Design a protein with these regions (language model features):
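Long, charged amphipathic helices and adjacent flexible linkers at domain junctions
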Residues: 114-133, 278-302
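N-terminal alpha/beta PP-like core and its mobile active-site loop of ThDP/TPP-dependent enzymes
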Residues: 1-274, 314-317, 397-400
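Acidic, Ser/Thr-rich peripheral helices and adjacent loops at domain boundaries
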Residues: 414-433
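Active-site nucleophile and cofactor-binding loops and adjacent substrate-binding regions
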Residues: 6-13, 74-75, 324-325, 343-357, ...
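Catalytic phosphate/nucleotide-handling subdomain of diverse soluble enzymes
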Residues: 355, 359-399, 403
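A short, conserved beta-to-alpha structural element at the edge of catalytic cores
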Residues: 38, 350, 395-419
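Active-site diphosphate/adenylate-binding microenvironment
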Residues: 286-369
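Glycine/aspartate-rich loop-and-adjacent alpha/beta segment that forms the canonical ThDP
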Residues: 106-129, 224, 229, 454-493
Length: 493
C-alpha cells in the first residue's frame, strides 16, 4: 500500500514529530519517519552523562510505545535492510508508523546498493477462518434486525467497493464511526448516521433494537458504546471483524464471534450469502435516520449546523473535507451530507488541536485537482498558525473555514459539568484571546471573507470558487453548544 514519509532533524526535530506519530498509530496510517542524529562517535551510549552530542536525544526509546517499529542505524551497510523492514511493518497487518534514526556519519556514508543486505518479509498469516465465515453467514441469516458498524478498517483494507456491494445486496442498515463515515454516501438508503456520544440519536437507538451487530474494521471505544459496554446493544449478538487480534481479544465489548481478517477478505467469503433485510426493519431504520434534528433557525450570528448544511450543498463532487477538533468536528460530522466520491478525515483518535491546517496542505499537494476544505476553530488555528505562511508562499489552494466562537467550547463544557462553570483560559473573559484574523490574513497575503450572519452564506460559494488559498471567518455565537444525542447508558466522563 501507499506510505507517507516525514523527515525531521535531530533533537527537537524528532520530538516535534511525536504527536503526529501518535496520530498515525491510533488512526492506522502507514508512515515512515526518518530522523537525524548526532554522529555515532558522539552518542552517549551507556555513559551516565545527560547528553554527549548537541541535540542528542534517544528518539527511538521515546517513540517505541507509539510505533510498530523503531530503530537506530549505526552501520551504513544495514540501511537497505532496515528501510525495507520498516516499510514492511508500516504497511502490513494493521498499518501504522515506523521510525528510523540516522546518525550523521551514516547519512554521509558512501554505499553500494547492489551489495546491501535485503529484508525478506514473512507472509502474514491469520488463524484458519473457514468455520468463522460459515458461522458469520449463519448468524446473519438468522437475524431479523441486523446492523452494521462501518469503521476505518473498511478503507484501510481497500474494501469500499466490496462494502457497498454487500450493503446494496443485503440492505442491512449501517451506522458509522467517525473514521468510517465516508464509506457510504449520505443519500444511500442504508446510511443511518454516526454511532456514539457525538453522533446521532437515531443511530444509537437503532443499535439498542438490533439483534445482530456486524462491526467491520471498527473498535468498540468508550465514545462509541459508553462506559458500560455490556449495556450497548444488549439484545444483540456481536460479530467483530478486525485485522488486529488485540482488538478482538481485549476490546471493551464482549464478542460472540471474533474474526481476525481484513474487511476485504471477510466480505469476499460472504459473496455467496443470500440474505436481504426485511421491510419492517428497514422502515424502522429510515425512521431512526429522520430523528436527527438540527438546531435550525436564524440566530444573531451563525448556526454552525446551518453553515455545514450550506457548505454541503456548495462543495464539489470530489471534495476532501478535513475538520479539526472540538465543536467544529462534532458539528461537521453530524451535519455534513457526503456525496459518492467525497472524503472526510481528521486525526480521529488522537485529536490534536491545529491538525487540520497542515493536514489540508498535504491533502491539497497530494490531490492538486481536488477541492480541499479545512474546517478549524479560532483556538485550533493558533496552534499551527505559521503554516499560513507556507500556504501563502507556495500558493497551496486550501479553502479554510475558520469557525470563530471566541473560545474553547469543549473545555467550557467540561468546566460547566465538572467545575460549576468556573472558566479558566477558555473564553474571552477568563484568559483566552485570539488575533484579528482579517489583519492576520493581510499580513500573510491570503484573501479573506467574513460570514457574520446567515445572510452572508453566499460567501461560501465565493470562497470555494476563489483561485488559490483563502480564509473565510465564520462568526459563531459564544454560547452555542453542539447537540449531543441521547447518551448510551453510563457515558459519564
Amino acid at each position: 500500500g501507499k506510505i507517507g514519509v516525514a523527515i525531521g532533524t535531530s533533537g527537537p526535530g524528532g520530538t516535534n514529530l511525536i504527536t503526529g506519530i501518535a496520530g498515525a498509530l491510533y488512526d492506522c496510517i502507514p508512515t515512515l519517519y526518518i530522523v537525524g542524529q548526532v554522529r555515532s562517535t558522539e552518542l552517549k551510549g551507556k555513559l551516565t552523562i545527560l547528553q554527549r552530542g548537541f541535540q542528542e536525544i534517544d528518539i527511538v526509546k521515546l517513540v517505541k510505545p507509539i510505533t510498530k517499529y523503531a530503530t537506530q542505524i549505526t552501520n551504513c551497510n544495514n540501511i537497505r535492510y532496515e528501510m525495507e523492514k520498516a516499510v514492511h511493518y508500516a504497511t502490513q497487518g494493521r498499518p501504522g508508523p515506523v521510525l528510523i534514526d540516522l546518525p550523521m556519519d551514516v547519512q554521509e556514508a558512501n554505499i553500494d546498493l547492489s551489495n546491501l543486505k535485503r529484508f525478506h518479509a514473512k507472509s502474514i498469516s491469520f488463524p484458519e477462518s473457514a468455520d468463522l465465515f460459515n458461522r458469520s453467514i449463519s448468524m446473519i441469516r438468522r437475524s431479523i434486525h441486523p446492523l452494521i458498524i462501518a469503521g476505518g478498517g473498511i478503507r484501510h483494507a481497500g474494501a469500499v467497493k466490496e462494502f457497498r456491494e454487500f450493503v446494496d445486496k443485503t440492505k442491512i442498515p449501517v451506522v458509522f464511526s467517525f473514521a468510517g463515515l465516508d464509506t457510504l454516501p449520505h443519500n444511500h438508503p442504508s446510511h443511518i448516521g454516526i454511532l456514539g456520544q457525538y453522533g446521532h440519536a437515531g443511530a444509537n437507538q437503532l443499535s439498542q433494537k438490533a439483534d445482530l451487530i456486524i462491526s467491520l474494521g471498527s473498535r468498540f471505544t468508550k465514545k462509541m458504546v459508553g462506559s458500560n459496554p455490556d449495556r450497548f446493544a444488549s439484545k444483540a449478538k456481536v460479530i467483530s471483524v478486525n485485522i488486529d487480534s488485540g482488538e478482538l481479544k481485549d476490546g471493551q465489548k464482549q464478542l460472540d464471534l471474533a474474526v481476525q481478517a481484513d474487511v476485504k477478505y471477510f466480505l469476499a467469503q460472504l459473496k455467496d450469502l443470500q440474505y436481504e433485510t426485511g421491510e419492517e426493519w428497514n422502515l424502522e431504520a429510515t425512521k431512526a435516520k429522520m430523528k436527527w434534528k438540527k438546531l435550525k433557525g436564524v440566530r444573531r450570528l451563525v448556526n454552525p449546523y446551518e453553515f455545514i448544511d450550506h457548505l454541503s450543498e456548495c462543495m464539489s463532487d470530489k471534495s476532501i473535507i478535513i475538520p479539526d477538533v472540538g465543536q467544529n468536528v462534532v458539528t461537521t460530522v453530524q451535519s455534513i451530507r457526503l456525496k459518492e466520491n467525497q472524503r472526510i478525515f481528521s486525526s480521529w483518535a488522537n485529536s490534536p488541536m491545529g491538525y487540520s491546517l497542515p493536514a489540508s496542505m498535504g491533502a491539497k499537494l497530494g490531490n492538486p485537482d481536488k477541492e480541499v476544505i479545512c474546517i478549524i476553530g479560532d483556538g485550533g488555528i493558533q496552534v499551527n498558525l505559521q503554516e499560513l505562511q507556507t500556504i501563502s508562499s507556495n500558493s497551496i489552494g486550501v479553502k479554510i473555514f475558520l469557525l470563530n466562537n471566541n473560545g474553547y467550547v469543549t473545555i467550557q463544557e467540561f468546566q460547566d459539568k465538572k467545575l460549576g462553570g468556573r472558566y479558566v483560559a477558555s473564553d474571552l473573559k477568563h484568559g483566552y484571546s485570539h488575533p484579528n484574523f482579517k489583519k492576520l490574513c493581510s499580513a500573510f497575503n491570503i484573501p479573506y471573507h467574513l460570514i457574520n450572519t446567515q445572510k452572508d452564506f453566499y460567501k461560501i460559494n465565493e470562497t470555494l470558487k476563489t483561485n488559490g488559498p483563502i480564509l473565510c471567518e465564520v462568526s459563531i455565537e459564544d454560547n452555542f453548544r453542539p447537540i449531543l444525542p441521547d447518551p448510551m447508558p453510563d457515558t459519564e466522563a
